[in-house]
Amino acid sequence: QHNRAVYLKDGWIRDPYIYLCEDGFYYLTGTTPTYGDTREAGDPYNLGLDHVSRKMGLKPSIVGYQIRVWRSPDLAEWEYLGEPFSLEKGYWAQQFPDAFQNKSKKNWLLWAPEMYRVDGKWVFVHTSPEPVGNGANLIIADHADKNDSFAFPMGDDMRDKHDPSLFRDDDGTWYLTWSNTEIAPLKPDFQGLAAKPVHIDPSDRSIGHEGATIRKIGKKYVLFGTAWSTDDSRKGSYNLYYCTADRITGPYSERRFAGRFLGHGTPFQDKKGQWWCTAFFNGNIAPVSKLGIQNRDLSETAQTINEQGTTIVPLEVKTGKDGDVYIRAIDPAYAVPGPDEAQRFQP
């Protein structure tokens, strides 16, 4: 039912991304371990962030170097498809083979992949800090499970594109967003940037520090972004915020609250048109209880109610008489900012 969070599936994942394809399947990908890595069984709450783990004396990150994909006809039963892409097959491996040869695979990292079906092909984007720094890829391939050949039409234009995300406007123009938040239209067939990037943000403050993406709801462009509730890295809850605009390049409204514990989630619609957002475990300690969470200050360290795995949270999305869009998590555990929230929102 569209009133409470739903735990979809287990398995270590960050930044879960769900895409409803024209073939009737929901596709799931995200930041994951490499296929066959058994470490997650003994370390289910691995942080996935080496620089944080080292400071805390925890085990190294189990993040891998592949895009991995699952699909489902109903969001309930999930089939594992495979690994349609791996970093050693990417554009930067072609440009800097020594970087790949000189760094152990355990230090190769593929973060936050997204996938789209375009003109009979699959288009993937992701970010990667290692073995080539800021080495994001835009990949065109034939299949969502296994591929032998790839196209990289953006080439060098994908360098320094942290957390890339794609958006297709009503006129068919594709836009790339990245790095909270730069945006630029793309040339036909993703052949590069069609114009210089424009910086977009809410009118009152930054949207956040990562995980930016755009949706169009009614006549409004909605920019989503992720930040810690306290405005202090890995302190408090990892939240989702948004702002709206009449033009894709802005100006945008003030930053608004979409949901607690929904940071770097994917807003998507199901087959009934209902809105949901993905959610995942992102904390320095094991998940905390939902009991009384609305009134609990979490500012001591990074904390979440999300179990390891993929959760989806129902969203209320409505358009006012003025055409503006209101978005808020429906489940009470996600619906209100906590006492640790740095921003004060209008009622």
Residue ranges and their predicted role:
Residues 1-347:
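Carbohydrate-active catalytic/glycan-binding domains of CAZyme proteins
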